[in-house]
UniProtKB/Swiss-Prot annotation:
InterPro entries, per the entry: CAP/MinC_C, MinC, MinC_C_sf, MinC_N, Septum_form_inhib_MinC_C
Key words of the record: Cell cycle, Cell division, Septation
Sequence similarity: Belongs to the MinC family.
One Pfam family of this chain: MinC_C
One GO process term, biological-process aspect: division septum assembly
Protein name per UniProt: Probable septum site-determining protein MinC
Protein role: Cell division inhibitor that blocks the formation of polar Z ring septums. Rapidly oscillates between the poles of the cell to destabilize FtsZ filaments that have formed before they mature into polar Z rings. Prevents FtsZ polymerization.
Ranges in coiled-coil conformation: none
Record text on subunit structure and interactions: Interacts with MinD and FtsZ.
The species this protein was found in: Shewanella woodyi (strain ATCC 51908 / MS32)
Highest taxon in the source lineage: Bacteria
Claim: Cell division is one of the keywords in the record: yes
C-alpha cells in the first residue's frame, strides 16, 4: 500500500504566550531584552503567540513588533485576543489569529514524571525537564541553568539559575539545600540574587508562588 504524501492529524503543542501590555515599543524592547538576558537560550527557537488583549489602538504597528521579535530570534506563529484591525494586519503579515476560547481558565497539564540528574551542573550547561519535574543530586554552579515544566529539587547548592513551572504551572516549587541562586523563577515570576537575599534569611529553602509573588520558606532541619 502506497504511503500518502501527507497526513493531517490533530495534536497538541506547548506554546509560550507573550503578553504585550502597552503601545510604547521602545519600553517593550527594553523589558524584552531584560527578560531574554536572564535566560538567553530558553526562548530561542520556541514557537510564540502574542496576546494583544490590552492593545486597543487600531493603528498599532504589528509589523514593527514582529520585526522586533524576529530580530531577537523569537519565532512568532500568531496572535490572540486582538481587535479586528490588528487581526487584519496579522493576516497580511502571514500570522495566525489564534482563538483563545477558554484557554485562560485551563490549568497546565501537571508533570507525571521526573528527570533525574546524578551529577553537578556546571557553568554554561543547561538542563530542561520537559513535562516533568527535575531532581538534581548535585550542585548547580554559577552560570548554569536548570529548567522544568514542573518542580525542581536540588540536593546540593543552587548557585546558578532555576526556572520551574516553565509551561505555566503556578503550583511548581523550587527546593534547594543551599539557596545561593543567581535567579529563581516560577511560572514566569522571578527573583534575582538581590531579591532572594532581601526576602530570605534562610540558607536552605522552598521557593513557591503565593498569589502573583514569590515567597521562600525555610526547610525543616
Amino acid at each position: 500500500m502506497q504511503t500518502p504524501s501527507l497526513e493531517l492529524k490533530g495534536s497538541s503543542f506547548t506554546l509560550s504566550v507573550l503578553h504585550i501590555n502597552q503601545l510604547d515599543l521602545e519600553k517593550v524592547t527594553i523589558e524584552l531584552d531584560g527578560k531574554l538576558a536572564i535566560a538567553p537560550q530558553f526562548f530561542l527557537g520556541a514557537p510564540l503567540v502574542v496576546n494583544l488583549s490590552r492593545i486597543k489602538a487600531p493603528d498599532y504597528n504589528l509589523a514593527a513588533l514582529k520585526d522586533l521579535l524576529i530580530s531577537r530570534q523569537l519565532v512568532i506563529v500568531g496572535i490572540t485576543e486582538a481587535i479586528d484591525e490588528i487581526a487584519t494586519q496579522a493576516k497580511a503579515l502571514g500570522l495566525a489569529n489564534i482563538k483563545s476560547g477558554k484557554q485562560s481558565n485551563t490549568q497546565p497539564q501537571l508533570p507525571k514524571t521526573s528527570k533525574i540528574v546524578k551529577q553537578n551542573v556546571r557553568s554554561g550547561q543547561q538542563i530542561y525537564a520537559k513535562n516533568a519535574d527535575l531532581v538534581i543530586f548535585g550542585t548547580v554552579g554559577n552560570g548554569a541553568e536548570v529548567i522544568a515544566d514542573g518542580s525542581i529539587h536540588i540536593y546540593g547548592n543552587l548557585r546558578g539559575k532555576a526556572m520551574a513551572g516553565a509551561s505555566g504551572d503556578k503550583h511548581a516549587i523550587i527546593i534547594a539545600r543551599s539557596l545561593e541562586a543567581e535567579l529563581v523563577s516560577i511560572a514566569g515570576q522571578y527573583w534575582l540574587a538581590e531579591n532572594i537575599q532581601h526576602n530570605s534569611t534562610t540558607k536552605s529553602g522552598c521557593v513557591r508562588l503565593e498569589g502573583e509573588s514569590l515567597t521562600i520558606e525555610a526547610l525543616p532541619l
